[in-house]
């Protein structure tokens, strides 16, 4: 059975460690006969949740005009969601956390999803990286019948220089 796979890459660097693993995951998903799409969060405008309760208490769409609604609709439509992040200060990137916070209005529609997590860090201590997975688990605890299918830990990965193709990189 063909599955719709949505890969959310929250690396701030195109071609960075977690983004590279996303590309490999996507290749494998397609080679296995699935549909796959990668959303590179860095290229999207996603505003912070303001806690206005328009979505949660009033059942109306978020009044913010950005790319979050489109991404969240893709999450609702997907069978499999891959959430990938570099680990900064022992947690997920701000880009990923901001998207998760914006899921408030439609999280009840994310039912029976399969999840994979990709976490990368310069650390070699997997236990420290598991803090990030625990944060993802907190999100899944709010969903109906999610299943964690796997976690990819990319450890001891160091960033040495910006990619020549990525002129917006900074140190």
Residue ranges and their predicted role:
Residues 12-15, 87-90, 121-126, 157-158:
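Short histidine/acidic/glycine/proline-rich micro-motifs that form metal-
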Residues 36-38, 146-153:
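Short beta-strand elements in bilobed, periplasmic/extracellular small-molecule ligand-binding domains
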Residues 41-43, 153-158:
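Short beta->alpha junction loops
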Residues 85-86, 165:
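Short, proline-centered helix/strand-breaking motifs
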Residues 111-149:
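Short, glycine-/small-residue-rich phosphate/pyrophosphate-handling segment
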Residues 159-170:
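Single conserved hydrophobic/aromatic residue that forms the stacking wall/gate
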